[in-house]
């Protein structure tokens, strides 16, 4: 399955026509790397779309202050489990796992890796934090029972690049 990542999509409000237009016109399923509350508040943009909401267990209902401290501005709150489930029930979206705390899995012990990769309930889809993985990470993800795992195609991550919002995920398992 081709899946396009809606990266840093914290601003899909009604005034942000550029982002909304990109979502409306995207012909592929969309993966949300973390699900900001603005997605829930402006969920009309999901009508007729499908995809995966990749959640980080420790940050559901919290903000993104954990990510690149002092480098990335705190955007807003992530959705709660209830909000994510409501959108999954209403639209053609699934819940995928993005670890508990979003660590670089290539830099943690195998014990911590297994803890981070293990979701709170069975899920079919996994996204590697920061897009990083190695053989040990691949093995742990496979042993956790995921059917598909995705890594962001890093490419250019310049916010002035028109492809900044959407980066293609690639399945690895």
Give names to the regions the model predicted.
Residues 58-61, 101-103, 133:
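Short, catalytically relevant binding-site loops at active-site mouths
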Residues 49, 91, 101, 145, ...:
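Residues that flank catalytic or metal-binding motifs in active/ligand-binding sites
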Residues 56, 100, 153-154:
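Proline- and acidic/polar-enriched loop/turn elements at helix boundaries
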Residues 79-115:
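Histidine/lysine/aspartate-rich catalytic loop segments that bind and position anionic ligands
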Residues 53, 95-97, 150-151:
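Hydrophobic residues in well-ordered beta-strands that form the structural core
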Residues 2-91:
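Active-site beta->alpha N-cap acidic-glycine motif
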Residues 1-32, 36-43, 107-173:
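C-terminal active-site subregion of NodB/CE4 polysaccharide deacetylases
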């Amino acid at each position: 399955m081709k899946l396009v990542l809606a990266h840093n999509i914290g601003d899909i409000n009604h005034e942000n026509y550029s982002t909304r237009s990109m979502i409306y016109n995207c012909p592929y399923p969309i993966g949300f790397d973390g699900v900001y509350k603005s997605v829930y508040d402006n969920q009309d943009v999901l009508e007729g779309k499908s995809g995966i909401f990749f959640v980080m267990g420790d940050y559901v209902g919290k903000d993104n202050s954990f990510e690149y401290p002092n480098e990335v501005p705190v955007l807003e709150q992530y959705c709660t489990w209830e909000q994510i489930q409501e959108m999954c029930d209403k639209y053609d979206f699934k819940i995928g796992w993005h670890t508990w705390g979003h660590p670089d899995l290539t830099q943690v012990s195998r014990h911590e890796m297994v803890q981070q990769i293990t979701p709170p309930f069975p899920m079919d889809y996994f996204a590697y934090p920061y897009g990083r993985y190695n053989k040990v990470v691949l093995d742990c993800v496979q042993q956790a029972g995921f059917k598909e795992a995705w890594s962001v195609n890093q490419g250019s991550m310049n916010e002035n690049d028109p492809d900044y919002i959407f980066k293609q995920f690639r399945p690895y398992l």
